[in-house]
Structure formats: C-alpha cells, structure tokens
Amino acid sequence: MKLHKASAAAAAVLVLSLTATACGGDSDSGDGGGKKITVGIKYDQPGLGLKTPDGKFTGFDVDVATYIAKELGYDAKDITFKQAPSAERENLIKNGDVKFVAATYTINDKRKAEVDFAGPYFLAHQDLLVRADDNSITKATDLNAKKLCSVTGSTSAQNVKEKLAPKADLQEYGGYSECITGLENKAVDALTTDNSILAGFAAQKEHQGKFKLVGLNLSDEPYGIGLKKGDKDLQTKINAALKKMVDDGSWDKFVKANFGPANYKTEPAPKVTEGS
C-alpha cells in the first residue's frame, strides 16, 4: 500500500513538472534567454515596414523593433514579425498576440486609454500625396471637392474630416497599397497619412515620377512603441533601448538607410517622454 502511495505521489510530481514545462516553453520572455518574441509591424509601408516578395522585412520600424528586441535579450532569429494593420494594433497588444508594436503608431490620448507607449522615437507630419501632374490641390481646403483616400483606423482620416476639410469625400481602404492603386487609377484624388509613409511610397522604383508630396504639415505625429497597459517594466526597458539607439548612432544610421533615397528631410530624434 505504501508503495502504491509513493508511486502515485511521484507520478503527480512528474505530471505537474511536465505541465509547467509545456506552459512555459514557447512563451515570450521579457529578458530573452532563448525565448521567442513576436513584434507587430506594418507589411505594406516602404521605408518603414514592408514584407518583400521573398519574405524578408525591411524599413525603419523594422530596424527599430529589431534593435529593441536585441536590447531585451533576443537574437534576430528569435524575432517573429506579425502584421499589425492600423485598426488592429490595440487588439493585438491587449490579446497578447504581440509583445510590442512598432508600426507608425502615433501616440495620442485615445490610444493611451487602451495601451501604453514607450518613446516617442520619431516625429512625422501629416501630408498629402497627389498625382505628379495634378496642381489642383495645394492646401487642405482644396480637399473639400476631392476624393480623399486614407486607411481605416488611421488618425489621418479623422484629422482631415473633423478639422481640415469636412466636405471631402473620404474613401477608407484597408491598406496604403490600395490607396496608391486608387490614386494612380484616378479613383481617388489624394492620399493622406504621415509624410514619412508617403515619401516611402513615392520613392519606390515603380512609383518614381508618378506622385508628389504637397508639402503640408497638417499635424504632428510622434511615433511610439505600443505595449500592454500597465507593463511599466517593459516600458522602462524599451525607453532605455530607444535612448541608447540614439546615443550610439543607430537611429541616424536607420534613418539614412531607409529615408535617404526619397530625399525626405527628417527631424532630429525626439526626446523620450512616455513613462517619465
């Protein structure tokens, strides 16, 4: 009888041990240690976050996210990039589908009610992209008689509709690539979003000479790293990584590599203020 009890106890310990191993083996770890990490980025933004046909990831946000992950203790091979469309970023963070999001994610009060941010790490401005031969749009009010394209979930569309051109015919598409196609085919007259995103598209080889930026600074767009609300430890670590990225010259290197070909004039790295 004692033998049976001992065997049962040993079996119970073994089951508990195996269960703990199964639960913890593949999860993200804030300090790396051989674990994997999933990061949300854009897949359709040249110069910022782009998944190429051969499955590689390029862009400023990709470089920033990779730098942060390495500072958190992860190797490049341990990073999985997950698509983070504008309308899905908060859900991806809250559901734990990603550890953090680096996807042209403008810091604002509405979003901060749902998620926390580290940063900012980049300052962009809202602008307009039009066809190269179109001189009818030179200011925001010209949009009142035009079809304006933006991406669902983006702050740019609300900014234009509420403050700048309330009579604009707003066309919300699922991705920027769709807006670019619509602009080229004259289904829409202009695309609005951050100038960094627009410059990336305009600089693509297949788009060179077809489009131009109007040159309007319609808003300030401070990009931050989105993370789960209340995770102060991760916020502190990411802020430290961002500061180091600027101090060691990596930020300048990433900017030159990703925006240089578009002749896009970036502003200096903004001061990290979130969490302070």
Predicted regions and their residues:
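Acidic, polar ligand-binding/catalytic clefts
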Residues: I79-D142
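Extracytoplasmic small-molecule ligand-binding "clamshell" domains
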Residues: D31-V101
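Periplasmic-binding protein-like
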Residues: Y43, L123-V130, A203-N239, P261-S276
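A ligand-binding cleft/hinge motif common to bilobed small-molecule-binding domains
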Residues: T104-A113, K161-E162, D189-D220
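Bilobed "Venus flytrap"/periplasmic-binding protein-like clamshell domains
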Residues: V39, P46, F57-E71, H125-E178, ...
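C-terminal motif of bacterial Sec signal peptides marking the signal peptidase cleavage site
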Residues: S17-A22
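Short helix-initiation/N-cap motifs at beta->coil->alpha
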Residues: I79-N91, N135-S136, Q171-T181, N185, ...
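Extended ligand-binding regions for polar small-molecule ligands
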Residues: G24, K70-E71, D134, S154, ...
